[in-house]
A protein has these predicted regions:
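Flexible, active-site-adjacent loop/turn segments at secondary-structure boundaries
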Residues: 3, 7, 87, 144
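Short loop/turn segments at secondary-structure transitions that flank enzyme active sites
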Residues: 39, 92, 130-134
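Conserved, short, structured surface segments that act as functional micro-motifs
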Residues: 76, 82, 100-181
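Zn2+-dependent peptidoglycan hydrolase active-site motif and core
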Residues: 28, 45-98, 117-127
């Protein structure tokens, strides 16, 4: 996935989505992870929709595929009960079906630009819904959990980008450490 990453949970968007963890309405409820370089994305655009996809999307934890839509799927974790949404997958190349049981790390599909018949940029939009005391099941910030998983895989701490040219669309949300998935 393309680096640097930045947290874009709670960014202002046009859709009327809310989260009790965001101070604004009309917010982004997940984390966008860009895939590939500009050259790789141009090469994918030349491919048929069935072929498109550069990076695999994998199961976050052991669980059951509970929903497959026109451009997304949902995995419910068996240990945590968290619901993970994987959006903009190549729906023609899914490796799973509804009610399939998966293990953490199993390939479920490939990231593409599907958006219900309208293409978007090549990226994975990743969401986590989890229980938050007093709020019920709500969208929670996935960014720190993704960074933690990356650092575990790489066997070390990631590099913080201090470049002032990387803009942040909205202020990051300070989250309760109990919401993080290790």
């Amino acid at each position: 996935y393309s680096m640097p990453w930045r947290d874009n949970f709670c960014e202002t968007r046009t859709s009327n989505r809310t989260s009790p963890l965001c101070s604004l309405n009309k917010v982004h409820q997940g984390q966008d992870l860009r895939t590939g370089t500009a050259t790789e994305c141009l090469q994918m655009r030349a491919q048929s929709p069935r072929e498109r996809g550069l990076h695999e999307a994998v199961a976050t934890e052991d669980g059951i595929i509970q929903y497959i839509g026109s451009y997304s799927l949902q995995l419910k974790g068996t240990e945590t009960g968290f619901i993970y949404s994987y959006v903009h997958l190549n729906m023609r190349r899914l490796q799973v079906s509804v009610m399939d049981t998966v293990k953490a790390g199993d390939v479920i599909g490939v990231v593409s630009n599907d958006f219900g018949g309208t293409p978007t940029t090549y990226h994975l939009h990743f969401e986590i819904k989890a229980p938050v005391e007093g709020e019920g099941i709500v969208h929670v910030p996935p960014y720190t959990s993704l960074v933690s998983a990356y650092e575990r895989r790489e066997g070390g701490i990631g590099r913080v980008v201090e470049d002032e040219t990387v803009e942040v669309a909205s202020a990051p949300v300070i989250v309760d450490p109990s919401w993080l998935i290790d």
